[in-house]
Curated annotation (Swiss-Prot):
GO terms for cellular component: cytoplasm. InterPro entries: KsgA/Erm, rRNA_Ade_diMease-like_C, rRNA_Ade_Mease_Trfase_CS, rRNA_Ade_methylase_Trfase_N, rRNA_adenine_dimethylase, SAM-dependent_MTases_sf. This is Probable ribosomal RNA small subunit methyltransferase A. Specifically dimethylates two adjacent adenosines in the loop of a conserved hairpin near the 3'-end of 16S rRNA in the 30S particle. May play a critical role in biogenesis of 30S subunits. It comes from Methanococcus aeolicus (strain ATCC BAA-1280 / DSM 17508 / OCM 812 / Nankai-3). It comes from the Archaea.
Length: 271
């Protein structure tokens, strides 16, 4: 069948890659597994053999021909014909996720998943995206994505996947990543909405020092630039001058959390 290019369809065909993904998730007979993207069902079938139930979310009804074949043999598979970004994932009751994600929704679906209660997610990403997700501070790949994901989860690189594992072959390499939810973040965050805006402000200027980056992108935390500059030069935040003087990409995860919480308190106090 003809793949839907608008949906970024590249169907997984390599059974060895399927096996690696399932092994990384440590699937057992008690698991309820969420899969995003049906494809031709190669991953779905293997999951169904090993777990209690598979819940598949698929947008493209043209793939129904593969679904009809699957349900005849595996009655423990349920499908939701919808856009995964529009489905209330929290209502589905899964404890694990294994999926070959459409790459154009990699970022929004990852953060949507991180808001859910699950044990582990094993996901296929574009290789460069996977590198940024697990990057440590001080590296060129360290980004807003790195910070936002690693605050909420442990990221483990499973393996690189070549274009030959898919049909049609994508123009980029891929990678399987294992995401394990943390019981507690590295540093308790007072306000997650502010934290996300704070990170956007920082990493829009990752090579600048932290104070300049925040001032340049004050709008990301709903601040007037001059007002934020005044606060960042005030005595109240003086004890964090060393952090404010560091280049953004050198800040550790904990340093970002500490600075974020204290700036949040100072801003609220000034209102």
């Amino acid at each position: 069948m003809q793949q839907n290019k608008k949906l970024g369809q590249c169907f997984l065909k390599d059974k060895n890659i399927v096996k690696k993904a399932i092994n990384a998730a440590n699937i057992n007979k008690n698991d309820i597994v969420l899969e995003i993207g049906l494809g031709k069902g190669i991953l779905t079938k293997e999951l169904a053999k090993q777990c209690k139930k598979v819940i598949v979310i698929e947008l493209d009804k043209k793939l129904e021909i593969f679904w009809e074949d699957i349900i005849k043999e595996y009655p423990n598979v349920e499908i939701i014909w919808n856009d995964a970004l529009k489905v209330n994932l929290k209502e589905l009751g899964f404890n694990k996720v294994v999926a070959n994600l459409p790459y154009q929704i990699s970022s929004p679906i990852t953060f949507k998943l991180l808001d859910c209660d699950f044990e582990v997610a094993v996901l296929m990403y574009q290789y460069e995206f996977a590198k940024r997700m697990g990057a440590p501070s001080g590296t060129k790949e360290y980004s807003r994505l790195s910070v936002s994901v690693q605050y909420r989860a442990v990221v483990d690189y499973v393996c690189k996947v070549s274009p030959s594992a898919f049909s049609p072959k994508p123009k980029v390499d891929s990678a399987i990543v294992k995401i394990t939810k943390k019981n507690e973040p590295i540093h308790n965050i007072d306000n997650w909405e502010f934290f996300d805006g704070f990170n956007r402000a920082l990493f829009q200027h990752r090579n600048k020092n932290t104070k300049k980056a925040l001032i340049h992108s004050a709008h990301e935390i709903n601040m007037d630039r001059d007002k934020l500059k005044e606060l960042l030069n005030s005595n109240e935040i003086m004890e964090f001058n060393d952090l404010l003087g560091k280049k953004v990409y050198t800040l550790s995860l904990k340093e970002i959390g500490v600075l974020c919480n204290n700036l949040y308190k100072i801003i609220n106090k000034s209102k």
